[in-house]
Amino acid sequence: MAKINDAWFTVEEINNETYAISEYGHWEKVHSFLLLGEKRAVLIDTGLGIDNIQRISKQLTSLPISVITTHVHWDHIGSHGAFDNIFVHKDEVDWLIHGIPKLSIEQIRMDVGRNITLPTPKTFNPSNYKPFQGQPSGVLEDGNVIDIGNRKLSILHTPGHSPGHISLLDHKYGYLFTGDLLYDQAPIYAFFPTTSPEDLVQSLEKIANLSSLTKIFGSHHTLGLDPSILLEVKKAVITLRENNLVRFGTGIHRFNGFSIQF
């Protein structure tokens, strides 16, 4: 890959068929992922929407791109409007079309506009920022398999952070893309009214039982975690349940390599 020098996005080659497109100039440190097959490509999320991620994806591939949405939070659907083929879990179709109930545009604009450390494009103005809303091209469910040509991706329904949150298992390379289910450096959030502590812990248990993983890619902060973190996830699940902590209001729980806030 020829090096892409971009003012906003950072492109990192994971392998010659997998790229991270990151937004390190924002406090969220968001990662989107472009996965190439022989017939088509998948873009896991489209970032913050501060700049148009399609400008980067076009430089990386000429394959037709399907956008797979880990969940319908504003920092993951920012450039959805630039793509024709958008897929979302069935439990968040309504959010994609109508927005998230009781999440004010004022709160979103405050969050998207704060703690920015890189120059933003002239087209970005937090005061008129609006998250994408629209109809998906297709609906995803747990167990769906997407074949992009000599590369199969399994959809895992992993709710908790949001009701229709999904993770993706890349069978070819053993990669697990966890969205906002698992990452480091900041708490995994399950304290909003639209979250579920019980579902989050069940989802963590679900991915902790996966085998033959080579790398875990969360959507924020450190790019690529060692699968050994799942041993700590298993311990965390037991600790949280045994101490009756899996409920709203119990605060931040810190473990080796990650933390969770209920």
Residues covered by each model-derived region:
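Short glycine/proline-enriched coil/turn segments at helix->beta-strand junctions
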Residues: 37-38, 61-64, 80-86, 171-173, ...
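Basic/polar N-terminal segments that are highly enriched at the extreme N-terminus
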Residues: 1-7
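Short Pro/Gly-enriched beta-strand edge/turn motifs at strand-loop
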Residues: 13-19, 124-128, 149-151
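Short acidic-hydrophobic surface loop/beta-edge motif
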Residues: 10-14, 35, 143-148, 253
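C-terminal regulatory/interaction regions
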Residues: 246-262
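Active-site HxH/HxHxD metal-binding segment of metal-dependent hydrolases
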Residues: 50-145, 228-250
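Conserved beta-strand hairpin/beta-sheet module of binuclear metal-dependent hydrolase folds
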Residues: 7-59, 167-184
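Metallo-beta-lactamase
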Residues: 41, 48-49, 138, 145, ...
